[in-house]
Amino acid sequence: MADASLATPAQVLDFWFGAGPEKWFSRDDAFDAAIRQRFLPTYEAAAAGRLNDWQATSEGALALLIVLDQFPRNMFRGSPRAYAADALALTVAKRAVAQNFDRQLDLPKRNFFYLPFQHSENLVDQERCVELSRENSDAEGVKWAELHADIIRRFGRFPHRNAVLGRVSTPEEQAFLDAGGFAG
């Protein structure tokens, strides 16, 4: 029996793609609160592995990636919890890409299969994101993939996460942040 408090993949996709890019990548406290109110139980179920059956289809895998990779960045902005499901999202993304689920969907949906690679602090994952973006994305997707990869090449991690994750910034990282750094 399905838990009525949990969203379906279609509800996740309708909400996310109905909001559009102007909401996805900018700070909006009301949008963050709406995600938290509507999707927190769904996120918690996904993070506990209870929604793994969503991976059976391209649309389901996409919805699971949004729940694991995008929603926490909104729901838990400024907290270590924003990144808590990144490893799980990356595992889902790798499996979905191996099944060519990304190529079954058009842009911008396709790009969300690549963001868990882009959010990884592992250079191999970053290089895979650049490769996937060059093959299957648009110029904007490639630009952001390359920017993220360059930061990991330079620092081995994302300096803009240091304060939230309780990490001490190196002098080079602090200079980068002081110069405007990267807040994405």
Residue positions per predicted region:
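Intrinsically disordered, low-complexity activation-like regions
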Residues: M1-G184
